[in-house]
């Protein structure tokens, strides 16, 4: 019975039912400017007009910059513009000029202007099979970084091997000695994403990393750097440095815990939970199901998720998953999908036939273990989680409150000027039934004054919870993870001159 229950929880992967689609009208351009930043958006179907419209205020912002100022220029286009991304990147690079480090990419929708979310208007199936259903939209986020800042860009095409993970000096030559933050963009077919994440975490431990995966466009390239379209499957890293530059990262995984905290007592391989508190995982899940509310039980059947954290982290505070009883202590769970069941070998016995010399092996297979999309170690803590719109809203609210507290306790005085928002393509209308939920919540938490831009990603890259600058945080929380159904916010600001 418990094995059947576990199979049901795995099989019913959580995919929110899309709301009824409504006819789309072209929206008025949305723009927002604050100090040295500009964000704009356009839904014009003509990519040339869309780039001009979204960049309407860029020239005014850049006119206030000195020749040696570093300029970060990001352009996001929905799948409706996928066939023109090379031309869009080139036109955008011309709009922002030679001083800027420009990136243009394809997402499942865009965030921009006054914090508006413009999704592509298609279901998940249509995104994969019929790009003509996607309503074109485009947004830009352009900023002049604080004095003394610099931007180093590196790109790794499938046939261009990045430095080995253990070669610190090679990575420092590429990205600088001590970047404040790195923006990481990659295509779903990227060959070097894992190595890039591992190297950034290993060699720049105080550097915040945020980014996302683009949405595939029939196998074609989806990212440009400085107006040039590189081969499909590339990974891009932008390293931002500067004494007055302040960059924070917040990641909300949109989940709620269900049941008690347990211990992983045995693993098989590196990604299989073989025992939880000395029992098969199916037995533990059955116990959680019996103690859950009707709503939690329904969500567990749709798709149970697993939250993991090192045992030592249970005594550390800071962001994580929303607790239904309002408890905000140490909820730093890395939430991962259950990707299958694996028979767990408990005992193995070998012997040989003296006459024939044949070697025999007998194995006793116990109950199936849980295969999860993360490395698991014996001693890790584990807790089952569920995901729905309520959990997603509550978790984002919790993470932003955590961010405000950690920012205040860090003691550094700085402004908040812009925010790069990267939600999953499975959020937005598909999850909440309306557009703009994540962006409105983030914008309000940042005081409503930040320039906002971003894109709907096919995988979100960031920490666990909120990481404020180089402030102390558990290593596993600072580590760069690829999330699902998450929203990542990268907050840009300028430190007070006295903080230099």
Question: What are these regions, as identified by a protein language model?
Answer:
Residues 1-3, 9, 29, 101, ...:
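N-terminal functional modules and adjacent low-complexity/disordered segments of proteins
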Residues 8-10, 25, 30, 327:
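Short, intrinsically disordered, low-complexity terminal segments
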Residues 21-27, 127:
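Basic polycationic patches enriched in arginine
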Residues 3-4, 21, 32, 124:
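N-terminal compositionally biased, intrinsically disordered segments and leader/signal-like regions
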Residues 2-20:
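N-terminal chloroplast transit peptides
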Residues 13-14, 29-35:
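N-terminal mitochondrial targeting presequences
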Residues 34-72, 77-85, 91-450, 455-500:
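Small-residue-enriched flexible segments
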